[in-house]
Amino acid sequence: MRLLIIFILMLSNSFASEVTDIKNLVINKELKSYSDITFLDIQNKELNLNDYKGNLVILNFWATWCAPCKDEMPSLDLLGENPNLDNLKIFPINIGKDTNQKSLTFFKDLEIKNLEIYFDSPNTLAKKFKLRGLPTTIFFNKDGLEFARIIGSIDFADEKF
């Protein structure tokens, strides 16, 4: 996991648009800036990505009906328990039309302990980021700029990282 974060940090300083050896990872040629990136927590409180500048941010888009999302979520959860990653903020954002209870059950069934549930309502981020499938994970540098994304599932605990 530590190698994953080091790799991602190195990528945040890279401007080469390419798919690397890591399955489904696309590195942006140029950093992408977005305005008004907001999402909701489980209490329907609005959060803004700008409030997390100074941190490396991961937005992971998922849904309860998505089998690859179910496979990926436990390894994403492991990133949240690493004490060496203080400046990493992970926001798993449900883009399905699921109820809070269904999302909580999904996390409980997978024994997710280090992540909280967030929602994209009403799917504005899915459109803004032009998501092509689930799961999709988008990486933002400390300036709040997108530098890479993973389209599809990945094992965040894989030794490649």
Language-model features: locations:
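Active-site acidic short loop of glycosyltransferases
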Residues: 52-55, 85, 112-114, 131
